[in-house]
């Protein structure tokens, strides 16, 4: 086998840390050509050389330029930021509790207990919580009287921009929560980014230089967490 056509180093993924756990040569990709003639050996070497060239081009396209081959901490600017889907929570309705809240003066956010009396042009005057007229800035929960006039249901379920029939179950309501982080994530990378960043490495003439120049990540017993090689000081 030609030494000028090395076997690529396959990276392994450390899911707990989101880092590459090291790399090792994939000897299973070698072809058995020990009994082949010069022509077959040349064809095998041609296939291997083409494979290495494809890997080099892929790494140049998808890998992020970085000074360290396997950084222990990826900055937020280089980490794929995922936008999780909203979370929908089912909230049970409690009409009795809502009646108690209304009788205690509870209102939806932005409401006001000052109501203009019918036919009066004087300034707002304080009055009971429940009235037949709603003046836009708040609604009361479980008001059976006003629900028929304004399209509000007595169980508190209402719609914006219309008063059509609601499809909600009277005893249920849904709350949608947006699951998003307040700060961009940093540290480890996900599986999709790992596949793009750590393309199988083609390392030419690995044993021709000084031992200190050989990447530690290519040593089989390299520990990505401690950034050391087991058995070496």
Curated annotation (Swiss-Prot):
Q: Could you give a GO molecular-function term held by this entry?
A: hexon binding
The entry's propeptide annotation covers 112-163
One Pfam match: Adeno_PVIII
Post-translational modification remark: Cleaved by the viral protease during virion maturation. May cause the middle segment to be shed from the capsid.
What InterPro entries does the entry give?
Answer: Adeno_PVIII (IPR000646)
- Indicate whether rRNA-binding appears among the record's keywords: no
Keywords of this protein's UniProt record, alphabetized? Capsid protein, Host nucleus, Late protein, Phosphoprotein, Virion
One GO CC annotation: viral capsid
Q: Which residues are recorded as modified (Phosphoserine)?
A: 180
Residues with site note (Cleavage):
111-112, 163-164
Where in the sequence is Phosphothreonine found?
64
Q: Which domain of life is it from?
A: Viruses
Question: What up-regulates or down-regulates this gene?
Answer: Expressed in the late phase of the viral replicative cycle.
Q: Summarize the subunit comment.
A: Interacts with the peripentonal hexons as well as the hexons in the facets. Part of a complex composed of the core-capsid bridging protein, the endosome lysis protein VI and the hexon-linking protein VIII; these interactions bridge the virus core to the capsid.
Q: Which HAMAP family match?
A: ADV_CAP8
- Give the free-text miscellaneous remark of the entry: All late proteins expressed from the major late promoter are produced by alternative splicing and alternative polyadenylation of the same gene giving rise to non-overlapping ORFs. A leader sequence is present in the N-terminus of all these mRNAs and is recognized by the viral shutoff protein to provide expression although conventional translation via ribosome scanning from the cap has been shut off in the host cell.
Q: What family does this chain come from, according to its entry? A: Belongs to the adenoviridae hexon-linking protein family.
Which protein are we looking at?
Answer: Pre-hexon-linking protein VIII
């Amino acid at each position: 086998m030609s030494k000028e056509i090395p076997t690529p180093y396959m990276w392994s993924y450390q899911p707990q840390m989101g880092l590459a756990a090291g790399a090792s040569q994939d000897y299973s990709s070698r072809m058995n050509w020990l009994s082949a003639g010069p022509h077959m050996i040349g064809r095998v070497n041609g296939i291997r050389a083409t494979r290495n060239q494809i890997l080099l081009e892929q790494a140049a396209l998808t890998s992020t330029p970085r000074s360290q081959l396997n950084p222990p901490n990826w900055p937020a600017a280089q980490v794929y930021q995922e936008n999780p889907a909203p979370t929908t929570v089912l909230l049970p309705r409690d009409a009795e509790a809502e009646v108690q809240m209304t009788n205690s003066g509870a209102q939806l956010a932005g409401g006001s207990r000052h109501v203009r009396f019918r036919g009066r042009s004087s300034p707002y005057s304080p009055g009971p919580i429940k009235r037949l007229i709603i003046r836009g800035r708040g609604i009361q929960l479980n008001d059976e009287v006003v629900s028929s006039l304004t399209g509000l249901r007595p169980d508190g379920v209402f719609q914006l921009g219309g008063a059509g029939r609601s499809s909600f179950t009277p005893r249920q309501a849904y709350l949608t929560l947006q699951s998003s982080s307040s700060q961009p994530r940093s540290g480890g990378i996900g599986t999709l980014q790992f596949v793009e960043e750590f393309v199988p490495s083609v390392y030419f003439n690995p044993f021709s230089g000084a031992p200190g120049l050989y990447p530690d990540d290519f040593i089989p017993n390299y520990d990505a967490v401690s950034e050391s090689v087991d058995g070496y000081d």
